[in-house]
Each structure stands twice: as C-alpha cells, then as structure tokens.
Amino acid sequence: MACLGFLLPVGFLLLISTVAGGKYGVAHVVSENWSKDYCILFSSDYITLPRDLHHAPLLPLYDGTKAPWCPGEDSPHQAQLRSPSQRPLRQTTAMVMRGNCSFHTKGWLAQGQGAHGLLIVSRVSDQQCSDTTLAPQDPRQPLADLTIPVAMLHYADMLDILSHTRGEAVVRVAMYAPPEPIIDYNMLVIFILAVGTVAAGGYWAGLTEANRLQRRRARRGGGSGGHHQLQEAAAAEGAQKEDNEDIPVDFTPAMTGVVVTLSCSLMLLLYFFYDHFVYVTIGIFGLGAGIGLYSCLSPLVCRLSLRQYQRPPHSLWASLPLPLLLLASLCATVIIFWVAYRNEDRWAWLLQDTLGISYCLFVLHRVRLPTLKNCSSFLLALLAFDVFFVFVTPFFTKTGESIMAQVALGPAESSSHERLPMVLKVPRLRVSALTLCSQPFSILGFGDIVVPGFLVAYCCRFDVQVCSRQIYFVACTVAYAVGLLVTFMAMVLMQMGQPALLYLVSSTLLTSLAVAACRQELSLFWTGQGRAKMCGLGCAPSAGSRQKQEGAADAHTASTLERGTSRGAGDLDSNPGEDTTEIVTISENEATNPEDRSDSSEGWSDAHLDPNELPFIPPGASEELMPLMPMAMLIPLMPLMPPPSELGHVHAQAQAHETGLPWAGLHKRKGLKVRKSMSTQAPL
C-alpha cells in the first residue's frame, strides 16, 4: 500500500505535466471557406517552431511539386537565383517533392528564393523518415545559414491540400509544434477499463466455482424419504446439466506450449504478411467477441420472467428459450455492425472496447488453470514471448523497431490500412500533434489483461475453497493495478512501447506467493488443493446464508440425538453397583473417518437387532444429511439376555451383524456422548 500511495501521486503529476514537442508538428492550412490541420515531421535538433498557432506566421502556400529542387538538375528556380530582384517565393511557404538531395540542400535553395518555410512531400513512412535529418551532405558545412523551418508532409496530405486549391483561391499555411503531453488522460481510462475487467473476470470465475461446489454438495446429500426421491432426482439432474454447461476448460502444460507456438507463428505471419492475416485476426475477434457478449448477457436475460415461445417439440431449437434466441440474434447484429464500421475513428472504438471487454470476461470465466504450477508456467512463458518480441527483435529488423510495435500499430506501408482489433483503444483526450499523426489512440493489448487475469481468477477460486474472505483475490487485483502503473511509468521514461507482462506478471505472481507464505498455505496454493479446508463458499453471496441454515439443522438433529441417547443410557444403567460406565466424547476425526472403528461402540455390541426392522439407507447417501433415529427408540428392540451359556453365541452373532448394519456409524458424531460399558452384563 505504501508503494501504491507513492505511485498514484507520481502518476497524477505525469498526467498534468507536458514536454516540448520532439519531431511532430502541425501544418494549419486555410483557404476562403475551408481549413484543416495536417501532421508534419521535423527535426527538433535544428528547427524551432512556435508552440501555438497564434504565434505562427500565416503565409501563402507556393506549389512547387512539379519542378525538381536539387542542385545540378534542370530547375527554373536555380536560374532565378542569378537574378535576386525576381523572387517568386518571397514571404511564402513552398511545398516541393522529395528528391535525391538532403533536406538541408532543399531548404537552402528555398531560402535563397525568399521562402519563409518549406514543406517537403514524401511517400515513405514515419519510421523510414526518422533517419532523415537536416545534416548536409558535407559534414564540414555548417547549418547556421539555414534559418527557415523545414518539415516533411505526407503525400496523401499533399493531394488533399491540392484538391482545395483549384481556381483562384489563395491557400495559406502556418506551421507550429504544440507541446506534447508525456502521458494523456486516456491512459487513466485504459487503466480503469483494464483493472475493472480483470477484477470482474476474476470475481465471476470465483462465483462460478462457488456455485459449482454448492451444487456438488447438494447432490451428495440426499434424504431417505420416499416422497422426496423424485424431487431430489430431478434437482440432481438439473444441477448436473447446469454443471456440464458451466464447467470451465482446464489449461494443461501441453496447452501452454501450443498457445506460445501459435502466438509466435501468428506474430511472424502478421509481420511478413500483414495485409492477409489481419483479416484472420478480425474474424477471430468477431467470433470470440460475439460469444463473449452472449455469455455476459445471457445470465441477465435468464433472470427475466419472459414467456417461452412454443416451438415444435422436434425442432432443433426446441430447448432454447425465445429470449436467448433474441439475444443471440442481437449479438450477431452487433458484430456485423462493428465489422462494417470498424474503421470509424470517431465512435467505433467504443464498440470495439465493449466487445473486447466481453471477450476477455468470457475467456477468464471459461478457462481455468487448476494449479499454480500450471498458471506460473503459462504466465512465465508468455512473459518471455513478450520480452523477446519487444526488446530483442529490434536488433533483427531493418527499421530498428520491434516486431510487436509494428504489428500492434500496423505497418505504415500497408495497403489495407487495417488495425488489429485485439486491443483496448482510447483516443487521445488532449489536443496535440500526436492526435493528427500516427498515434491518435493509446492501446493496451488483450494479452496484458487476460494473462494476468488468469492468476487473479485462480486466486478467487482458491479463496472460495479455503474460505479466506477474498484475501488472495484482492491482493492480486491490487498488484495488477500497481504493475500497470509501473508499466505506464516505464513507457514514459523510456519513450517506447513496453512489454507490459514483464511488470504485470512479476507483481501479481510475487504478491500471490507472498500472501500464501504469510498465511502458511503455500503448499495448498501451489497445488490448488484448497478443498481440504473447505468450510463454506466465500465468494458466493448467497452461499453463506444457506450454510448457516444447514448448520442450524445439523445442530438441532445432533441435540435431539443426544437427548435420546441419554434417556436410553439411563435405562441401561439401572444398577449402578454392577456396571461401571464412563462418558466418551467422539472427536471430529473419528466422526468423519468411516474406517476408524472407535472403541466407543463396545457398549452397543451386546445388542442383537434385526436389520429388517431398521430404515433402509441408500449407500450413496451422505452421512451428514442422513435422518437420525434417537437411541431411545432402539432400546425396546433389544431382547432379553439369554443364559450365560448362550451369551458367547449371541455376542458373536451381534458382532457379525454390526459390520453390515447401516446404523453402525450413527453415533460417531462430533461432541456426541455415548456410555461405554466396562463390564459384562449379568444374566437375568
């Protein structure tokens, strides 16, 4: 908590702080009835642009894109250099095409013609232009003689500008570099969405585990009443059906290897064949998001008291209610709508984030890692995958950029102009050059949510099994939030994309292990054998009340049995001079272990009872929920004792019957007092 209290103020300071622009700027183009802003790229080491539009000069735009602008080439502007009295570029901003000479050479030619600014149009991407500087071809040539701003403009933006310059309209342009924030407010939105998704998915997984254990306990505890058997059978069948529908998929170590292999393969295929395989990811996202949206909304729809539509009994959809059919149709319509308008930057990101969150919740709910060993191996394998594709791959790419960043943002030379949908994306909320340039959105991959979310879900399931009041779940969720804050800080300090799993997996895994070690449950937490301490359903809100009712019923039954036993024992103990008795208290271990034959049953070994006179108890019935017969009712069934010559035969026969009687373990109750005979009974 102390670390969290330190990181939150620091993160807030980073939110409100700004830094001077680096290489991105804005070209504000204005005509008589039209204006628009365009992204420009410049070198902040050699050029200083005004910080706001009010201080930027608004100059006429000169179109020089049809003539070469390099020394030695046949250019009419070079001839004009010989006549200083004629300067057609005087007090204008020239726009020329990128040639074979350096930016400095072009800027020097434009400055010689009287231009006050130069826009160089280029077809290459930002990554390829990042190596282009204003350094002259001759290193010994100084840059002091270049005083005008020189910036690069995209070719598509040049075409858009020229489309508005038809006729005699005068077009003016102003270049400036607004301050860029270190971190935008949209990162706070992404933080809330990510932490909320992880917490909701983990809690949903724990709630499902609690309901599953509750149904299992209900199926194991059955009564002997004949009129309840049909109802119990129907309830067991319905619970079994719900259990089969809600049962999660256990993740094995073999699946970990398959997932890592497929992830590496898909990453490389997207890097080399992005325009083809991006549609594969769009299809996978559409299918998974549709199923996830249906899975999240179906519990709410099922709670509505809507009448089922009467369909033919032999129909394929006869068992599916009408509300669920309508919900499935709605989910399919939403997916089709998103596919059609997925590239609308103004509002489509809201729909994509909604579908993405439902997809993540569905995965966290349906996929279960049964042990911490499997969970740790899965998280560490994907951690190595993330670190490799972010920190190692830049040494092998031509542009020096990581494969992960190029695939996540999409190659600039992509002809499809598609973006991967497997991310949470929020547009920048502060106006800056980055809003117009290649980074209008801040993104967070689904892997940075789902992979640590598996551990959060495991912690909540473990809380259910050991009744720890969600200690593991809360600690792991807070650790995820702290790890995400550290990820944002590392991204700001290093000015590059970060392998978020490096911080998220470390924080969540170490925190969970520390909590288990402090509670001395490390072995149980590692193996996932929390059911050994199951005493209730900690994550299910409705389970506590049901547990209290069951405990009250057991206490009432035990007290009734104890009173009946006391009365029966009093009848047997009519002659205190001949018999010496002692009170035996059955321990909890003896009561719950059917194989441990307690010595307290010796007092009942002389009873010769007919098994046909006892109620029939099903073999599968739970001993805890078995209807108990007071011991006072058993006393009249005992026959008179035979002469001493027949006592041995009767005693042996009673012991033979004792092993097969279903009531042999009825007295083995926690805290149940039974009288133990210390002498043989005298003959009558």
Curated annotation (Swiss-Prot):
Residues 594-611 have a biased composition (Basic and acidic residues). It is a multi-pass membrane protein. A motif (PAL) lies at residues 499-501. Residues 216-242, 548-614 are annotated as: Disordered. One of its GO terms (molecular function) is protein homodimerization activity. Residues 83-163 form the PA domain. This is Signal peptide peptidase-like 2C. The gene is SPPL2C.
